[in-house]
UniProtKB/Swiss-Prot annotation:
The keyword Hydrolase applies. This is Metalloprotease slr1322. It is an enzyme of class 3 (hydrolase). Keywords: Hydrolase, Metalloprotease, Protease. GO terms for biological process: proteolysis. It comes from Synechocystis sp. (strain ATCC 27184 / PCC 6803 / Kazusa).
Length: 489
């Protein structure tokens, strides 16, 4: 029987990395028995996703720490398939009896029952444990992260730097979180895999005001494999960049609404491709028939100069994973090549229901969610143009340096605020602009991305969908969109 987790009241010092608490090969016998019970009951497929989390967030507002929040959780999600139907049950009781009860509930939802108590049920054979955590010595990561006092000191020092560089600052916020997650996946196809993930993010948010003039600028970065990440954060440079952007936007003119060619900066500019197109290439959308690309595989859906990828392999990128939450090794997935749709993003359920092959993209926020097809590191590939080539091609347009929030409809209609923009005239930046909103549809914008530079950049992001919020990377080089509706004044 697997070990029982005992929670300490001393949250700051608690960790799950002592040998007796790990999710590892010692769970094989219990999970093999449970999987055998599920198959004997008539299920076509059964999966257990076990998880332990040690999370902490820290917020500094101006010159005080206003929030320091540790959170611990553990639990398991049980998924049962019968034909193309499935159900999902989660529990925070990870004892053998707790997992058996969750399995029994899942089976009953599909009209199945566990074998009688005296029945002989053979254990299901699991593969040798694929231990991504052990292979990369991830078991030591949590011990090496910044303790809470160090988090607080670094963020307060960062806010002082921001105060030094910013003018007319009304609110300075520095925020950090560390999310340590251990997962173990066992399934009736023999899958038996373990991993530890360490996700960290830190950044600034600055609000400035001078009379009637207002502006808000934020900047975050993230990492997935460096326990020393917070210690090595370049708060000085980040503070300078945020303060400089805020200073330019504070007195910027409002943009005039109209249709313009736009140049989008690299890195976080890729959020529009992620939101307006990437989600439409997830098999979840195919299942619900809410994507305009439903039957377009092999057809042209974008400008011939556009190639795009989704992958989980780039070192330290925010969406990088060694395996997905269904135990499948990650990989590179070519989405679009020279404008032609090549592949969709698929999890197990999406593959069963749509026929598209799995891509190592089954992801979830936690054990409370069933995995679904989700993006990882998604970006437009570098092109053959220089940044100067792109700017020189624009007689009058808008340069979108930083993107803000936005919304996307089920079939790809979007609007996104631009938090830092500039007027482009004859290939040159002439003045800062504020109040710009980009409005369009996925099918429209994809065919108007006519130029891509060679300076691919990636940025950390957070993506919400049916399986909760997951960590992702968005990215692109500088790109030109030949024309798009820009809302303004």
């Amino acid at each position: 029987m697997p070990p029982t987790l005992l929670l300490s009241q001393d949250l700051p010092s608690l960790n799950y990395t002592t040998p007796g608490d790990r999710l590892d090969g010692r769970w094989r016998e219990s999970l093999s028995t449970l999987l055998g019970l599920g198959r004997a009951a008539g299920a076509d497929f059964v999966e257990f996703f076990l998880e332990k989390v040690n999370y902490v967030s820290c917020l500094a507002e101006d010159d005080a720490i206003t929030s320091l929040t540790p959170r611990l959780s553990s639990g398991c999600g049980v998924r049962v398939y019968k034909g193309k139907g499935d159900c999902y049950v989660s529990t925070n009781d990870i004892s053998f009896n707790g997992l058996r009860t969750a399995l029994e509930k899942g089976l009953s939802i599909l009209g199945l029952t566990l074998p009688a108590g005296q029945s002989f049920v053979p254990e299901l054979n699991l593969e040798m444990l694929r231990d991504y955590a052990g292979a990369k010595e991830k078991d030591q990561w949590l011990h090496r992260c910044s303790p809470m006092q160090e988090m607080s000191d670094i963020l307060l020092g960062a806010n002082q730097k921001l105060d030094h560089y910013a003018s007319h600052a009304q609110s300075r916020r520095a925020a950090y979180f560390r999310d340590w997650q251990e997962v173990l996946v066992a399934a009736s196809d023999g899958t038996f895999a373990r991993d530890i993930r360490l996700t960290q993010s830190v950044g600034f948010s600055l609000f400035c005001a001078d009379g009637e003039h207002r502006t808000s600028i934020g900047k975050r970065s993230g990492d997935t494999s460096n326990p020393d990440y917070l210690r090595t954060w370049d708060a000085e440079t980040s503070a300078q960049e945020v303060a400089e952007s805020a200073g330019k936007m504070l007195y910027a003119d409002y943009v005039e609404s109209g249709n313009y060619p736009i140049i989008m900066a690299n890195q976080f500019g890729g959020v529009i491709f992620h939101e307006a197109c990437g989600h439409l290439l997830e098999t979840t959308q195919i299942e619900h028939k809410t994507t305009p690309f439903l039957d377009k595989k092999g057809e042209k859906i974008a400008h011939e100069n556009l190639t795009a990828w989704d992958e989980g392999l780039t070192d330290n990128a925010f969406g990088t994973i060694d395996m997905d939450d269904e135990g499948m090794p990650t990989q590179r997935t070519l989405l679009i090549e020279n404008g032609i749709l090549k592949n969709f993003i698929a999890d197990r359920t999406g593959s069963i229901r749509t026929g598209h092959p799995r891509t190592g993209s089954g992801r979830r926020q936690s054990y409370a969610y069933a995995a679904a097809s989700r993006m990882r590191n998604t970006y437009i590939a570098p092109g053959n143009y220089s940044v100067d080539d792109i700017f020189n091609s624009v007689e009058k347009g808008i340069y979108c340096k930083q993107m803000g929030g936005g919304s996307v409809g089920a079939t790809g209609e979007f609007n996104f605020a631009v938090s830092e923009a500039y007027l482009v005239e004859n290939g040159k930046l002439t003045k800062p602009l504020k109040g710009a909103t980009l409005i369009g549809t996925a099918t429209e914008i994809m065919n108007k991305i006519s130029m891509s530079s060679q300076d691919l950049g990636l940025a950390a992001g957070f993506c919400g969908s049916v399986s909760g919020s997951v960590y992702v990377t968005v990215g692109q080089p500088h790109i030109k969109v030949d024309g798009i509706t820009v809302g303004g004044r």
